[in-house]
Curated annotation (Swiss-Prot):
InterPro entries named among the record's database cross-references: ENTH, ENTH/VHS_tepsin, ENTH_VHS, TEPSIN
Family matches, as SUPFAM superfamilies: ENTH/VHS domain
Annotated Pfam families: ENTH (PF01417)
Listed name of the protein: AP-4 complex accessory subunit Tepsin
Gene of this entry: TEPSIN
Annotated consequence of substituting residue 477 to A: No effect on interaction with AP4B1 in vitro
Length: 525
């Protein structure tokens, strides 16, 4: 800066310090409009006051938070058109602080994300373009303190103006008519057109600022919420020479002593990508997958995998941009790079629900790969030699009788034996033979009859109960009276073999042959 301001100007500046403290506070309360005019008056007092004012504003711009930086930048932008010429001169000499604010970044806010950083960067770029523009700024001469500038709708600060107010503003020189391709009625911008045509030039300036802000830093939440197809169609060609921060980040990630990224390196990489252009970082990483060393390729693959595990970019978009390079690496000679590329490619395809051409054209199963039959679950299980067989196939042996041993006076029914050609364990891998033996074993399987013994399956005419009953096969507990009566009946017939009879059997013997046996016959005894 220039020489130190005199002591008198410093003391005069101290009286205006509360105004500056209120206008540049570190909170989200916007600066009141009247403070802009009060601060502009300070710059018109004297060159020393302008120098003190600039020193204070630049110190606040350097040390304050995001809200304070944004307020200081708005005050400086207002002073570009309402401040003194000496203030603008010394502000141009200290433009390094404005360039530092143009690269302002930090960790995203949990609620607002990176919106505050983008506003600060856009305001700094707007201030720099206004301060160093080719057009001459409309600087008014230093006004005395006693005559403040006239403010209000339609008011003009002209000494000889007779009529003031809305509708009496003097028209300035002619304005060149420009051709607007998107306008209706021939596409010519007229002087008396509506607000849509008047705001076209302002929208173009705002679009330039927003585009530059999007190139310098992208919001992680907005990048993750885009549709993958829309990203593939609307992706802009990013000039790698304009992405110096992204290029330095990729160089730092791909150059390391180890072949894989540590957890700290991956976290630092994801945090840095949240403040930069993630699409440019992905494009630079894919450039390091070809023509580089094996260690560089592995670190680039790890960085791509870390980027895919975050929510900065959709996995469909990452797969669309990296699939050709990953497929080329996965088809190379076996090695760590090939394995890593194949693993990442399969992970992205599984996450996106897509299949690679190599996996999609699989060979059709031959006739030997037919679906196994229902008996193959156990017939195909062959025990190891020397091991105990716990589970045998269904068709190995017929179902044996599970009834308890009959008493001494109870004659047992003969159980048929299977034919002698039935082998205990069929040959594995022969489903037709297993099915045939399973059907044969079902034909010779004994079934339980209501009498309590097992007998071979007979036709419906030889069965005691031709119709299935709800309580068929259930043995009821006999009452003590019925048991005593049964014992007396047994003593009267000593020659008959004694066998335990249930109440259902006795009831069935008393009832006529045509009636259905009842499960509650003991209630009527």
């Amino acid at each position: 800066m220039a020489a130190a301001p005199p002591l008198r100007d410093r003391l005069s500046f101290l009286h205006r310090l509360p105004i500056l403290l209120k206008g540049t506070s570190d909170d989200d309360v916007p600066c009141p409009g009247y403070l802009f005019e009060e601060i502009a008056k300070i710059s018109h007092e004297s060159p020393g006051s302008s120098q003190c004012l600039l020193e204070y504003l630049l110190s606040r711009l350097h040390s304050s938070s995001g809200h304070g930086k944004l307020k200081v930048l708005k005050i400086l932008l207002y002073l570009c058109s309402h401040g003194s010429s000496f203030f603008l001169l010394i502000l141009k000499r200290n433009s390094a602080f404005i360039q530092e604010a143009a690269a302002f970044a930090g960790p995203p806010d949990p609620l607002h994300g990176n919106s505050l950083y983008q506003k600060v960067r856009a305001a700094a770029q707007d201030l720099g373009s206004t301060l160093f523009s080719d057009t001459v700024l409309p600087l008014a001469p230093s006004q005395p303190l006693g005559t403040p500038p006239a403010t209000g709708m339609g008011s003009q600060a002209r000494p000889h103006s007779t009529l003031q107010g809305f509708g009496y503003s003097k028209e300035h020189g002619r304005t060149a008519v420009r051709h607007q391709p998107g306008q209706a009625g021939g596409g010519w911008d007229e002087l008396d057109s509506g607000p849509s045509s008047q705001n076209s030039s302002q929208n173009s300036d705002l679009s330039r600022v927003s585009d530059s802000g999007s190139h310098s830093g992208s919001d992680s939440h907005s990048g993750a919420s885009r549709e993958p197809g829309d990203l593939a169609e609307r992706v802009e060609v990013v000039a790698l020479s304009d992405c110096q921060q992204e290029l330095s980040l990729v160089r730092t990630v791909t150059r390391g002593p180890r072949a894989f990224l540590s957890r700290e390196e991956a976290q630092h990489f994801i945090k840095a990508c949240g403040l930069l252009n993630c699409e440019a970082v992905l494009q630079l990483l894919t450039c390091h997958l070809r023509g580089t060393s094996e260690c560089t390729q592995l670190r680039a693959l790890c960085a791509i995998a870390s980027l895919g595990s975050s929510d900065l970019l959709p996995q469909e978009h990452i797969l669309l941009r990296t699939r050709p390079w990953l497929q080329e690496l996965s088809m190379g000679s076996p090695g760590p790079v090939t394995n890593k590329a194949t693993k990442i490619l399969r992970h992205f395809e599984a996450s996106c629900g897509q299949l690679s051409p190599a996996r999609g054209t699989s060979a059709e199963p031959g006739p030997t790969a037919a679906l196994p039959g229902p008996s193959d679950l156990l017939t195909d299980a062959v025990p190891l030699p020397g091991s105990q067989v716990f589970l045998q196939p269904l068709s190995s042996t017929p179902v044996s009788s599970r009834s308890p041993a009959p008493s001494s006076g109870m004659p047992s029914s003969p159980v048929p034996t299977p034919p002698p050609d039935a082998s205990p364990i069929p040959a594995p891998g022969d489903p037709s033979e297993a099915e045939a033996r399973l059907a044969e074993s079902r034909r010779w399987r004994p079934e339980r009859i209501p009498g309590g013994t097992d007998s071979p399956k007979r036709g419906p005419s030889s069965c005691a109960w031709s119709r299935d009953s709800l309580f068929a096969g259930m043995e009821l507990v006999a009452c003590p009276r019925l048991v005593g009566a049964g014992a007396a009946a047994g003593e009267s017939c000593p020659d008959a073999p004694r066998a335990p009879q249930t109440s259902s059997q006795r009831t069935a013997a008393k009832e006529p042959p045509g009636s259905e046996p009842s499960a509650f016959a003991f209630l009527n005894a």
